[in-house]
Amino acid sequence: MNWLTNVVRPKIRNILRRETPENLWIKCPDTGQLVFYKDVEQNQFVIPGSNYHMRMGATARLRSVFDNETWYDVALPEVTADPLKFRDERKYVDRIKDARAKTGAHDAVKVGYGKLEGLGVVAAVQDFDFMGGSLGMAAGEAIIRGLELAVEKHAPFIMFAASGGARMQEGILSLMQMPRTTVAVQLLREAGLPYIVVLTNPTTGGVTASYAMLGDIQLAEPGALIGFAGARVIEQTIREKLPDGFQRAEYLRDHGMVDMVVHRHELRPTLARLCRILTKTPLPAVEEPAVVDDDAQDIEAVATEIVATPPEPAPPPAAPQA
């Protein structure tokens, strides 16, 4: 009996077992509801019902912004992978390899150029899944290159921020990207081009202390965590209890730090409208279909029938009687 239970039965179970993909279902962080992954993906990673905004990868974000889901990937400068030969529990180069394998991206920032409702724009997206969207040399160079391209193309620049801050494995070289990106934003301003920032969940640390809070227009997604230091650190420093919703997008909007909180489904038309207003670009001409008037059709049909069927000649007048 032991042979049957210990050897044969496990083998049968292994044969009949069907593996279930890990990402088949998604649990809503707000309500705990289990939602089918494909439904969330088709809904732009917004949980149906609760409207909780999940994190969005860089490629999916660019796909949701540009017309026909097409754009040109901007070639980005190469940087030294591990300038400080940094190691904590693991080597920094090993962490980068794992992040690249997980996301399929070269680093935390992806830049694209394409059309947004017919208007050429440059967009940069931080991917939080790549080492927390941390700002390092590669990310800094990517943002700067995107801003330079916007000046070259005379196009608006849209920044989708999502980061835990500067990348500690690169030390001062990471912190250097804060003033460098700030200078690049200023060059865009001097060219008279709009810089629009979309703050997504989360945007914290050195990113909020630099380019993420320099937008001509500051947008945020609902419920996004936005701040420099964490709420717990602030409470321990000031020895006071923070108000409810502190550092959330809605709180920042109510206190003047953010211009608008925009649902992800409304983000694309909102960005297009802002870009057109700030660049004084008229709406593209739309050929309106000819309006068919049923009454006019009836009149035309009757007129055609009258022309095609001439009236019968009138009978000759009768002779007068004597």
Swiss-Prot record:
UniProt KW keywords: ATP-binding, Cytoplasm, Fatty acid biosynthesis, Fatty acid metabolism, Lipid biosynthesis, Lipid metabolism, Nucleotide-binding, Transferase
Pathway: Lipid metabolism; malonyl-CoA biosynthesis; malonyl-CoA from acetyl-CoA: step 1/1
Entry GO MF terms: acetyl-CoA carboxylase activity; ATP binding; carboxyl- or carbamoyltransferase activity
Domain of life of the organism encoding this protein: Bacteria
Group of enzyme by EC: transferase
UniProt keyword S-adenosyl-L-methionine, yes or no: no
A Gene Ontology BP annotation from the UniProt entry: malonyl-CoA biosynthetic process
Compartment annotation: Cytoplasm
UniProt-listed Enzyme Commission number(s): 2.1.3.15
Catalytic activity: N(6)-carboxybiotinyl-L-lysyl-[protein] + acetyl-CoA = N(6)-biotinyl-L-lysyl-[protein] + malonyl-CoA
InterPro entries registered for this protein in UniProt: AcCoA_carboxyl_beta, Acetyl_CoA_COase_Trfase_b_su, ClpP/crotonase-like_dom_sf, COA_CT_N
Record-annotated CoA carboxyltransferase N-terminal domain positions: 24-293
Subcellular location, principal: cytoplasm
UniProt GO cellular component terms: acetate CoA-transferase complex
Family the entry assigns: Belongs to the AccD/PCCB family.
Role summary: Component of the acetyl coenzyme A carboxylase (ACC) complex. Biotin carboxylase (BC) catalyzes the carboxylation of biotin on its carrier protein (BCCP) and then the CO(2) group is transferred by the transcarboxylase to acetyl-CoA to form malonyl-CoA.
Self-association state and partner proteins as the record states: Acetyl-CoA carboxylase is a heterohexamer composed of biotin carboxyl carrier protein (AccB), biotin carboxylase (AccC) and two subunits each of ACCase subunit alpha (AccA) and ACCase subunit beta (AccD).
Protein known as: Acetyl-coenzyme A carboxylase carboxyl transferase subunit beta
Species: Rhodopseudomonas palustris (strain HaA2)
Organismal lineage: Bacteria, Pseudomonadati, Pseudomonadota, Alphaproteobacteria, Hyphomicrobiales
